[in-house]
């Protein structure tokens, strides 16, 4: 059974997104325990007018969630792009994972480099809410590929 945590910068998700997230997590339940956590604090709020300060605040907030006994993946536009089969292979190799989705300014280079991998979901820019949705869908698809579930045809 996979254990997957997804951390993203932000306050509570809107209901329209939350319903989709919950559906994808529910579909993945037989293969993985997936937890999502939005993080937002005073330091992040105070730093929003300065990109460098904001990225530092995101990194400082995420650091306690880095897994010492798992595989840490930073979502980053300069990260590696994988197709669904390569992503499934990544899931096959690692059963305990943490994904980090930055805020509006992305993540500090030093934080990205401290992770085991930088992953790009697409060359397109997308909001962290859409990125989380795409990630959850690809997690379900990858787990379906591994377990020969008919979702991925």
From Swiss-Prot:
Lineage of the organism: Bacteria, Pseudomonadati, Campylobacterota, Epsilonproteobacteria, Nautiliales
Record flagged with keyword Chloroplast: no
Residue positions binding S-adenosyl-L-methionine: 75, 102, 121-126
The reaction(s) this protein catalyses: pseudouridine(1915) in 23S rRNA + S-adenosyl-L-methionine = N(3)-methylpseudouridine(1915) in 23S rRNA + S-adenosyl-L-homocysteine + H(+)
EC class of the enzyme, as a word: transferase
Location of the protein in the cell: Cytoplasm
Family of this protein: Belongs to the RNA methyltransferase RlmH family.
InterPro entries: Alpha/beta_knot_MTases, RlmH-like, tRNA_m1G_MTases_N
Keywords associated with the record: Cytoplasm, Methyltransferase, rRNA processing, S-adenosyl-L-methionine, Transferase
Coiled coil is among the record's keywords: no
Gene Ontology molecular function: any one: rRNA (pseudouridine-N3-)-methyltransferase activity
Source organism of this protein record: Nitratiruptor sp. (strain SB155-2)
Function comment: Specifically methylates the pseudouridine at position 1915 (m3Psi1915) in 23S rRNA.
Record text on subunit structure and interactions: Homodimer.
Pfam families: SPOUT_MTase
GO (cellular component) term, any one: cytoplasm
Identification of the protein by name: Ribosomal RNA large subunit methyltransferase H
Primary localization class, coarse: cytoplasm
EC number: 2.1.1.177
Domain of life: Bacteria
Primary gene name: rlmH
């Amino acid at each position: 059974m996979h254990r997957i945590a997804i951390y993203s910068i932000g306050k509570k998700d809107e209901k329209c997104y939350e319903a989709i997230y919950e559906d994808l997590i529910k579909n993945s339940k037989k293969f993985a325990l997936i937890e999502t956590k939005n993080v937002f604090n005073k330091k992040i709020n105070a730093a929003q007018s300065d990109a460098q300060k904001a990225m530092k605040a995101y990194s400082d907030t995420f650091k306690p969630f880095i897994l010492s006994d798992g595989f840490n993946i930073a979502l980053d536009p300069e990260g590696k792009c994988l197709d669904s089969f390569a992503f499934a292979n990544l899931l096959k190799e690692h059963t305990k994972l943490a994904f980090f989705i930055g805020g509006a300014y992305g993540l500090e280079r030093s934080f990205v480099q401290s992770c085991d991998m930088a992953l790009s979901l697409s060359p397109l820019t997308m909001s962290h809410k859409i990125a989380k949705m795409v990630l959850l869908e690809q997690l379900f698809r990858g787990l379906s590929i591994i377990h020969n579930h008919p979702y991925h045809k």
